[in-house]
Amino acid sequence: IAGPKVLEHIVDTVLQFEGDQHYMYRILRSIKNRFGSTAELGIYEMRQDGLRQVSNPSELLLSQDHEGMSGIAIASAIEGIRPFLIETQALVSSAVYGNPQRSATGFDIRRMNMLLAVLEKRVGFKLAQKDVFLNIAGGLKVNDPAIDLAVISAILSSNMDTAIEPEICMAGEIGLSGEIRPVNRIEQRIGEAEKLGFKRFILPKYNLQGLNTSKLKIELIPVRKVEEAFRALFG
């Protein structure tokens, strides 16, 4: 294969710079590294004087005041080897132009459609005739399946027009049967949420096994099914 791939085979390290002209944040990923891990990631902010490293991205990516606003859920994500909190925003409304619209920014649209099917089939929420818009705040593209729980929580919150308590953070992958599957590096995810002052953390029940909770000040809410997460969030 001629072209850039030839150069990629010659060099020791390949870095990929991701970003968009409409957003201030840029992500630097390691695609190839012969002398270290490729699970490294750097987040930078574009300013007037150039790029500056973001030392604590969680604080910048979260809204300062979303209390009382429906359609917002906070997820604890892992990108590379660093945990950070992201704000998941959803808007659900009745379809007025015939075919319902599905749109996702910063999240895989096919995975969102799968999660909508799980909500309808397993939990009983009728969203087939609703427009659903999803956005990961800050212009980031997140591939971590652990934000599934926050995605469906934001969608349900918007559909019911009921806000999620602002001190709740969550992490969990959703399976096709509606089960909440365990996620990796749960200690780091919980620690990041606790550091930023969150009081409650919803997590897969399986992740409690072997987890040292004696020093944690944050309340852990283990769940096995989407229905249990729904009750924990909305009563």
What residue spans do the PLM features occupy?
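Peripheral, non-AAA+ core regions of ATP-driven protein-machinery
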Residues: 1-235
